[in-house]
Amino acid sequence: MPKRDKLLSEFGRNVSRFRDQAGLSQEKLAENAEIDRTYLSGIERGVRNPGIKTVLRLARALHVTVDQLCKGVEA
């Protein structure tokens, strides 16, 4: 798997894990982060590459730090 794909997959797994821990649906997290649910789905599946604004919105909506979202993600 190319390095970029691994990075996106790991980030997506982190988002999904924190979302599950928070008891949020994709719909609710997307609403809280002000992004489209299908975009969030793509992030969680590792097929979308979110920009810094989206990463910050997700972190805020999940009540975690950007560092926590990026844990284990190696560029």
PLM region spans:
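A detector for short, charged/polar N-terminal pre-domain segments
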Residues: 1-10
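Short, charged recognition helix plus adjacent turn
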Residues: 2, 60, 71-75
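Short amphipathic helical patch at the helix-1/turn junction of helix-turn-helix
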Residues: 9, 20-21, 49
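Short basic helix-loop element that most often maps to the first helix and adjoining turn
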Residues: 13-32
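Conserved hydrophobic/aromatic packing and binding residues within compact polymer-binding modules
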Residues: 15, 29-30, 40-43, 69
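Recognition helix of helix-turn-helix/homeodomain-like DNA-binding domains
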Residues: 34-48
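DNA major-groove recognition helix of helix-turn-helix/homeodomain DNA-binding modules
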Residues: 53-68
